[in-house]
Regions:
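Extreme N-terminus of proteins, especially the signal/transit-peptide cleavage junction
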Residues: 1-3, 120, 144
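Conserved acetyl-CoA-binding loop-helix of GNAT-fold acetyltransferases
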Residues: 93-96, 102-115, 119, 138-142
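Conserved beta-strand-loop-alpha-helix junction that forms the acyl-donor binding cleft
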Residues: 97, 101, 127-136, 153-157
Length: 157
């Protein structure tokens, strides 16, 4: 299936940001990093720090993954760091909507992202994935991503 990466409109970005703030809070609760009480506020602050100018934040790219029929299949958020010594770009967020999952499209989307990142001058890509998201961990490893560090936790009480 062919698809493109299209810039999000301001309205699409605002919807994406809202969804992302909620999801980041949820993932940090699931991982045990934040409590439910503090999660939403911390998530909102993290997004404010990462993209203070919203969609217009420098070197941040917010794309819809769109098929040839014009359907929005998912999203990608990439930061192309012009100052990184190894010319590394960072994938802040990537996902497919439920109807498009499980069809091999994530692999194709990541291959398309590889090309776009190269066009932006990146020589390598990095990302963060929560350990409890085993499906994503498997996908990224299958696509050639290697673990660079592992953070572990032990509950004492």
């Amino acid at each position: 299936m062919a698809f493109t990466l299209e810039d999000m409109t301001e309205e699409e970005f605002e919807a994406f940001r809202g969804m992302s703030v909620q999801n980041y809070a949820k993932q940090n609760i699931t991982s045990g990093t934040w409590t439910e009480k503090e999660a939403l506020e911390k998530s909102e602050q993290a997004y404010e720090n990462m993209i203070p100018n919203g969609r217009d934040s420098s070197n941040h790219y917010f794309w819809n993954i769109t098929n040839v029929q014009g359907e929005r299949m998912g999203w990608l958020w990439l930061y192309a760091d012009p100052f990184h010594p190894q010319k590394e770009a960072f994938i802040y967020s990537f996902g497919l909507y439920e109807a498009f999952r499980g069809k091999g499209l994530a692999q194709l989307a990541l291959q398309t992202l590889d090309e776009r990142a190269r066009e932006l001058g990146a020589e390598r890509l990095a990302l963060h994935v929560f350990a409890h998201n085993e499906t994503a961990v498997y996908l990224y490893q299958k696509m050639g991503y290697a673990m660079t560090n592992i953070r572990m936790r032990k509950q004492l009480s």
